[in-house]
């Protein structure tokens, strides 16, 4: 409520607004009690920017162009395109090695991972993996890459030895469709979101990295279209973006009347911990689609690209986790469809380009970048981090 009152006060004073600058939009406004948000657009002129990540030193952005079958390099300081590398068909998620030397890119339709030499701006190897690789993370020591293969009848995470640049084994999940993966801050656990086609209760696997075995599967009841997963910095919680269908039909198509809400689910990572499905927006007709996320380094804010609403939604994680900690599982289940909750943890909804499908943060957390799939550009957001 305090945040909402402050935002309303700023709106009345004219401190939040939007100015059309040709094809670009400039937006400024307030976040909580410090800093501001300002959106500008970097034009890439390449079709379908689907995923965005950043070099460890914060100097370069890497944008996977799903329809252009390429990766665009952008200088983060000047916001200018510095290069483009051709990869394989339909690149999606990518990950940079900790030393900043190589970029590993999932080529969904080619069933492969491209290894890009960042300094040379060149693909140096293609590694064949399972069906439809869509998510990838690299271990903190840089020695291993984990690739989520989300084909509808596929249940494997392929493991790549980055020194040899080849697939060495597969880790099998408890159900089909691992879409994205994330590694715990201590490097011991791999979490995979399972977007199993046809299931109304999609789930998350917690995998022991040392043994490669699933140690627990946690169900998100009445969930669909799981998109992304991130850990809190302390490793005690994960956040998962997804939609929740409100009336299931034999043919699950929006034009036949299926209505969704947009959700983020917070899962306590300890065995048997709480699962809190929290709303982001009002009911909609399949146009919300919360996608990629980024957690700021201190765990204060969560940034969510809401692809169908063309904005980044920012949540106050202290308030979100305060709600989870102070409530029983029964209470959380009762509150999960209460849209009134949103005002308690919502910080801001920042307009972007069209269809932000992926977001990333600078290493210091001062800038958020959103890849806008339908407008072929990147929105740069100044955050509230001092």
From Swiss-Prot:
The free-text function statement in the UniProt record for this protein reads:
Component of the hydrazine synthase complex that catalyzes the condensation of nitric oxide (NO) with ammonium to form hydrazine. The beta subunit may play a role in modulating transport of the hydroxylamine intermediate through a tunnel between the gamma and alpha subunit's active site.
What are the GO cellular component annotations? anammoxosome
Induction, as annotated: Is among the most highly expressed proteins in the proteome.
In Swiss-Prot or TrEMBL terms, this protein is called Hydrazine synthase subunit beta
Its taxonomic path starts at: Bacteria, Pseudomonadati, Planctomycetota, Candidatus Brocadiia, Candidatus Brocadiales
Primary subcellular site in the record, as a coarse category: other
Signal peptide start-end: 1-34
- Cellular localization per UniProt: Anammoxosome
Q: Which residues form a coiled coil?
A: none
The domain of life is Bacteria
Keyword Aminoacyl-tRNA synthetase present in the record's keywords: the answer is: no
Alphabetized NCBIfam families for the sequence: beta_rpt_yvtn
Q: In which pathway does it act?
A: Nitrogen metabolism
Keyword annotations from UniProtKB, A to Z: Signal
| InterPro entries cross-referenced by the UniProt entry | Host-pathogen_enzymatic-act, N2O_reductase_N, WD40/YVTN_repeat-like_dom_sf, YNCE-like_beta-prop, YVTN_b-propeller_repeat
Query: Tell me, how does this one assemble?
Result: Part of the hydrazine synthase complex that forms an elongated dimer of heterotrimers composed of one alpha, one beta and one gamma subunit.
């Amino acid at each position: 409520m305090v945040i909402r009152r402050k935002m309303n006060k700023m709106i009345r004073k004219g401190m939040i607004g939007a100015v059309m600058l040709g094809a670009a939009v400039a937006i400024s406004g307030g976040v909580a009690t410090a800093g501001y948000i300002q959106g500008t657009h970097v034009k890439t002129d390449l079709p379908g920017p689907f995923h965005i990540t950043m070099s460890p030193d914060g100097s370069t952005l890497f944008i996977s162009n799903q329809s252009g079958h390429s990766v665009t390099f952008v200088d983060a300081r000047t916001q200018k395109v510095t290069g483009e590398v051709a990869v394989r068909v339909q690149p999606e998620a990518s990950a940079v090695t900790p030393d900043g030397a190589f970029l590993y890119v999932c080529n969904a339709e080619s069933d492969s991972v491209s290894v890009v030499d960042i300094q040379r701006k060149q693909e140096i190897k293609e590694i064949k993996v399972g069906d439809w690789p869509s998510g990838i993370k690299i271990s903190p020591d840089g020695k291993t890459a984990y690739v989520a293969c989300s084909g509808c009848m596929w249940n494997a995470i392929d493991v790549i030895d980055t020194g040899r640049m080849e697939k060495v084994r597969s880790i099998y999940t408890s159900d089909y469709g691992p879409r994205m993966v994330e590694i715990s801050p201590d490097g011991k656990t791999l979490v995979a979101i399972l977007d199993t086609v046809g299931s109304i209760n999609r789930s998350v696997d917690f995998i022991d990295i040392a043994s490669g075995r699933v140690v627990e599967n946690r169900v998100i009841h009445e969930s669909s279209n799981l998109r992304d997963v991130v850990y809190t910095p302390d490793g005690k919680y994960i956040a998962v973006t997804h939609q929740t269908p409100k009336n299931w039909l034999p043919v699950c198509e929006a034009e036949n009347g299926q209505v969704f809400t947009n959700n983020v689910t917070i899962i306590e990572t300890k065995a048997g911990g709480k699962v809190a499905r929290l709303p982001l927006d009002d009911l909609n007709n399949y146009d919300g689609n919360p996608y990629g996320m980024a957690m700021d380094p201190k765990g204060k804010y969560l940034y969510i690209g809401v692809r169908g609403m063309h904005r980044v939604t920012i949540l106050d994680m202290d308030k979100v986790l305060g709600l989870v900690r102070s409530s029983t599982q029964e209470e959380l289940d009762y509150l999960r469809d209460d849209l009134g909750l949103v005002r308690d943890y919502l910080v801001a909804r920042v307009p972007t380009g069209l269809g932000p499908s992926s977001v990333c943060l600078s290493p210091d957390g001062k800038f958020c970048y959103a890849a806008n799939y339908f407008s072929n550009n990147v929105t740069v957001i100044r955050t509230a981090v001092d």
